[in-house]
């Protein structure tokens, strides 16, 4: 099915589009297998932030331009002393900020993977809530081969997903795994033919759109809290506070303060 994706905002190294309440963030550097630079990452952070705040958007897709690669990680050509160097000549690892944003954004984020998801690209796949993989997808880590590693979500959370033994294999041996192998280890949710991957991804997104956004928000926060320690608890607590602010009980406390009177909390139920 051909869809008319609407461009929401123009960027240099990514695309940011909208279709039927679904945002799509596309890394647009196919000439380098969608490897990212600090500028690519900053643009993705901006797009994801806008998607978080946009009331039209229920679900977000992350993908790469073309059929050959989802993302091949950081562009080694701009890797300098202490990080990846952008236009400002400051070495950065701002992809860590993007990883955290994908984790805490209160909307489902779905990785749509075609071709290579390697290195930092595989880590982006890992931190997404769900993954729809094309049958040509290839996953793996390369860090120890190129003098790098991800000791955060890319290893610790990966181990939660595929098990510690498998995660160590992935990192220690730096092998590549096809789509079926990724499915078997729980790294992706489903595998479909390449020409059907967008249809399947959009179908999953449309199914989630039919469900309670508050329920999905809290489920995401709860699962994150299990793995993210106090940072995860902070996310869930913040979501709970926002929900509480919408209740008559919370409004009674606010209004009583503004009206300089004692609040009447006795009127509200005390559920067991």
Swiss-Prot record:
Q: Which reaction does it catalyse?
A: 2-succinylbenzoyl-CoA + H(+) = 1,4-dihydroxy-2-naphthoyl-CoA + H2O
Q: Per the record, where is site Important for catalysis? A: 84, 245
Which positions are annotated as binding hydrogencarbonate?
Answer: 141-143
The GO cellular component terms are: cytosol
Listed EC numbers:
4.1.3.36
Q: Give the pathway listed in the UniProt entry for this protein.
A: Quinol/quinone metabolism; 1,4-dihydroxy-2-naphthoate biosynthesis; 1,4-dihydroxy-2-naphthoate from chorismate: step 6/7; Quinol/quinone metabolism; menaquinone biosynthesis
Which cofactors must be present for this protein to function? hydrogencarbonate
Quick check: keyword Lyase in the entry?
Answer: yes
Question: What are the Basic and acidic residues biased-composition ranges?
Answer: 253-264
Q: Where is this region: Disordered?
A: 253-272
Mind listing the GO biological process terms from this record?
menaquinone biosynthetic process
Q: Which GO terms describe its molecular function?
A: 1,4-dihydroxy-2-naphthoyl-CoA synthase activity
Supply the PROSITE patterns for this chain.
Answer: ENOYL_COA_HYDRATASE (PS00166)
Residues binding substrate: 33, 72-76, 84, 116-120, 142, 148, 245, 260
| This protein's UniProt keywords | Lyase, Menaquinone biosynthesis
**Is the Thylakoid keyword given for this protein?**
no
Protein family: Belongs to the enoyl-CoA hydratase/isomerase family. MenB subfamily.
The protein's job, in short, is:
Converts o-succinylbenzoyl-CoA (OSB-CoA) to 1,4-dihydroxy-2-naphthoyl-CoA (DHNA-CoA).
Q: What is this protein called?
A: 1,4-dihydroxy-2-naphthoyl-CoA synthase
- Species for this entry: Staphylococcus saprophyticus subsp. saprophyticus (strain ATCC 15305 / DSM 20229 / NCIMB 8711 / NCTC 7292 / S-41)
Q: Which gene encodes it?
A: menB
